[in-house]
Amino acid sequence: MSEIHLNKAAYIHNLTKICDKAGGKENVIVVLKDNAYGHGARLIASEAKKFGIKNCAVKSECEANEIADIFENILILSHVPTGDESAKFTYAINDIDALLKIKENTKINLAIDTGMHRNGLDISELDYAFEILARRNLELLGAYTHFRASDELNADYFVQRENFSAAKAKILALCDEFGIKKPIFHSHNSAALERASEIKDEMVRVGIAQYGYAQFNGSLNLKPVLSLWAKRVSRRVLKSGQSVGYGAKFIAKDDINVATYDLGYGDGLLRYNGLGELRLANGELILGKISMDSFSCKDSGEWVCVFEDANVWAEFFGTINYDILVKLSPNITRKFI
C-alpha cells in the first residue's frame, strides 16, 4: 500500500526556526486542522507536544476530540454553536450570534474582523459583545485576527495590523471596565511571522510553515516534512506502438519497461489528464492519465516517490501547496522516519 513519510528531523527543524522567531515555544499555536494539512493530525500533534508546544488550533470539535488526549489547550476555529460545548476546549466566536448561542461559562476566543470580512466581530460590535460575554459568564481567553494577504507584498498586511492594534486597545479598555482578565492576543499566521520584524502579540498561529513551506523563499530556511510514496502493483514490457492507461494518451516509441503504482485521484492526487509533462520525484514522467487508484511510469522499482515537495505538483496544476497536501486521503498510511 502507498505511504506518506514524515521527516522527523525536518519537522523539528521547522519548529525550532518558528519558535526562535516567535520568541519561544510557549508563544506558538500550531494549526492542525484538516488532518494537519494532510500530514496526519495525531502524528503531528504527538511530535509537536514532545517538542514542547502547548497550544494548538483545529477546525471542529470532531478534530479536537481526535487529539484531546495529546493537547490540553485546543482552540476550535470554525465551530457553529450548539449550546452543548465542551469544557475541555476553547471556541472561536466568529459573529455576535455565536456569543448568544454558545453554552454559558464556555472558554472563548474573539475573532476580530480587521479587513478580511470572512469571520469575526467588527470593532464597533465590541461594546455589545462584552455585555453579552459578561452576562453569560463566558471565559475570554484570547482575541485574534487573520490577515487576508500577508503572503503578498502590498499594504493590506499593514492596514490590518493597525486595525488589530485599535481592536486590542478597545478590548483592553473593555476588560478593565468589566473586570475581565486580559486575554492573549494572536494575529500572525505563517506568512506574517516570516515578514514580521517585531511581534507585538503574545502568540503566533502557524500552519503551513511547520510543514516546511514558506511564502517568502528562504526567509526561515524551512524543510518540507512530507513525501508521498507509491508501491508497485504490476510491471510489463510496453511494446513500441502500444499505449498505457485510459484514452491512450501515451504511446511508446520504443519497447520500455513500465509499472503501475497504487496511487490515483481516489487517494487525493489531482487528476492528471495525460497532457504536459508531470514528473515524479526521480524525474520520471507519469505515462498517460492518472486513474482512480493507480498511475503508470517507467518501472522505478518496488517503491517510487511521487513528490517530496508539494510545490512541484502545485506549480504543474496551477494551484497552491495547501491544495496538494490537504487532499491526500486519510486512508494512506503515514509514519515518521
From Swiss-Prot:
EC number: 5.1.1.1
Stored PROSITE patterns: ALANINE_RACEMASE
Protein's UniProt name: Alanine racemase
Gene Ontology terms describing biological process: D-alanine biosynthetic process; peptidoglycan biosynthetic process
Pathway: Amino-acid biosynthesis; D-alanine biosynthesis; D-alanine from L-alanine: step 1/1
Described purpose of this protein according to its UniProt entry: Catalyzes the interconversion of L-alanine and D-alanine. May also act on other amino acids.
Keywords per UniProt: Isomerase, Pyridoxal phosphate
Matching PANTHER family: ALANINE RACEMASE, ALANINE RACEMASE, CATABOLIC-RELATED
GO molecular function, one term: pyridoxal phosphate binding
